[in-house]
């Protein structure tokens, strides 16, 4: 009886520690940039691609914060990603980005009405020149850049802001982890 209680207390302590580490390890986005926007140098030879509005009837990713989104069930979390699933969702002040493995589509979402555009840089692990997908469609919109990446490769997203008048990129920025192009982790 005593051993059973000890196990329950140990499990509860472990779950509490895990929940605390998730909350402190992934802080919520601020309403604005902490120290203002700071210019970012992009790698030489980066190609800028203007994103297009998704077609009618296309399921677009959510622009709401992950913390506000409904929690997935454990069964759904273990299932293989659906064809239109957006992987590697990454957000920074005013911008959100993700990668749809079916069709190699980069999504760039603009979340702030500040006169700037959302930008999602895409880097590969196999030496392809970096590209940036720009969303000039305005606040609360998604733009897509349809690319073709090597199926055996991985991509990494860099989300930041872009000023179309000056052609400059600005922090705050955020990076995703490596995302398999074929969607299979």
Task: Locate predicted features.
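N-terminal prepro-regions of secreted/extracellular proteins
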Residues: 1-93
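Mature secreted bioactive peptide module from preproproteins
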Residues: 76-185
């Amino acid at each position: 009886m005593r051993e059973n209680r000890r196990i329950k207390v140990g499990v509860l302590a472990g779950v509490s520690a895990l929940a605390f580490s998730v909350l402190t390890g992934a802080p919520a986005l601020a309403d604005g940039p902490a120290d203002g926007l700071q210019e970012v140098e992009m790698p030489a030879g980066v190609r800028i691609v203007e994103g297009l509005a998704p077609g009618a009837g296309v399921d677009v990713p959510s622009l709401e914060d992950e913390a506000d989104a409904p929690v997935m069930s454990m069964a759904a979390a273990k299932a293989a990603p659906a064809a239109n699933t957006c992987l590697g969702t990454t957000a920074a002040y005013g911008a959100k980005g993700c990668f749809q493995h079916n069709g190699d589509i980069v999504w760039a979402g603009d979340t702030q009405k500040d006169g700037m555009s959302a930008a999602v840089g895409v880097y590969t692990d196999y030496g392809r020149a970096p590209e940036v997908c720009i969303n000039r469609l305005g606040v609360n919109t998604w733009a897509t850049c349809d690319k073709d990446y090597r199926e055996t490769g991985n991509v990494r997203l860099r989300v930041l802001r872009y000023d179309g008048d000056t052609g400059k990129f600005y922090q705050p920025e955020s990076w995703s982890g490596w995302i398999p192009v074929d969607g299979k982790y």
